[in-house]
Amino acid sequence: MSGLWAQVVTQYGTFKVEIIGSLAIQVLFWWVPSAGFVLLDRLAPSFAAKHKIQPAPKQPTSSEIFDAVLISFRNQLIITGLQVTPAILSTRSSAFQITPSLPSTKDFILHFLICLIAREILFYYAHRLLHLPYLYRRIHKIHHKFTAPVSFASQYAHPVEHIVANTIPIVLPPVLLQTHILTMWAFVSWQLIETATVHSGYDFFGGAAYRHDRHHERFNVHFGGMPWLDRLHGTDEIEGLVKKHN
């Protein structure tokens, strides 16, 4: 593994490794799972119906899902542009460590956990901010078009929201830590799978999707990806979760 990674970095250089690797992560851990969740209705209709959180009449139409795909693709192009431009204009090759050596196990675990906690804090308060009436009407309302969300809706957002709430909370912690790119990719992969899952509309993985589904349905509960800040601020709707899973 270490020999293969060293060969890739040496042969292709830091710029190509970062950009191509980051795009591959998006495809493998967001586009593929999101498509899988959306196609579940056709591939396993009885199973899908059993696990759908909201009833069929509330589900988005095919044209709405296609619109979510287009907007998500646009948002990813914007982020890729923001990632590529500084790398081209700056003399510094990358904000992350891209070295022939692998990250140590200690650094990998420590940076991953710090990024996980920091992302949750940044996302929760950015999300709460976007629910202020002025910002909600002008920016965040677009994302809430999907009152019964699907995975592709996780990146269906105003460009400002996609940068401030979806991207910065994930990217800023590893940038500040100067994390190894492999640790960064592992963290981003986790976040992409999580957001595809919680927007899937299915009751998988211990109620995570149910919490965010209720946020899209009610707007004023379950702002976080994890429940602990919602519990701290009284936005967790604990009674609803208990009834749902008992």
UniProtKB/Swiss-Prot annotation:
Its main location: endoplasmic reticulum. PANTHER family: STEROL DESATURASE. The chain crosses the membrane at residues 19-39. It is found in: Endoplasmic reticulum membrane. It comes from Gibberella zeae (strain ATCC MYA-4620 / CBS 123657 / FGSC 9075 / NRRL 31084 / PH-1) (Wheat head blight fungus). Pfam families: FA_hydroxylase. Pathway: Steroid metabolism; ergosterol biosynthesis. Its EC number is 1.14.18.-. Keywords: Endoplasmic reticulum, Lipid biosynthesis, Lipid metabolism, Membrane, NAD, Oxidoreductase, Steroid biosynthesis, Steroid metabolism, Sterol biosynthesis, Sterol metabolism, Transmembrane, Transmembrane helix. Heterotetramer of ERG25, ERG26, ERG27 and ERG28. ERG28 acts as a scaffold to tether ERG27 and other 4,4-demethylation-related enzymes, forming a demethylation enzyme complex, in the endoplasmic reticulum. Its cofactor is Fe cation. In Fusarium, the biosynthesis pathway of the sterol precursors leading to the prevalent sterol ergosterol differs from yeast. The ringsystem of lanosterol in S.cerevisiae is firstly demethylised in three enzymatic steps leading to the intermediate zymosterol and secondly a methyl group is added to zymosterol by the sterol 24-C-methyltransferase to form fecosterol. In Fusarium, lanosterol is firstly transmethylated by the sterol 24-C-methyltransferase leading to the intermediate eburicol and secondly demethylated in three steps to form fecosterol. A motif (Histidine box-3) lies at residues 210-216. The histidine box domains may contain the active site and/or be involved in metal ion binding. This is C-4 methylsterol oxidase ERG25. Belongs to the sterol desaturase family. It is a single-pass membrane protein. A motif (Histidine box-2) lies at residues 140-144. One of its GO terms (molecular function) is oxidoreductase activity. A motif (Histidine box-1) lies at residues 127-131. It comes from the Eukaryota. InterPro entries: Fatty_acid_hydroxylase, Sterol_Desaturase_Related.
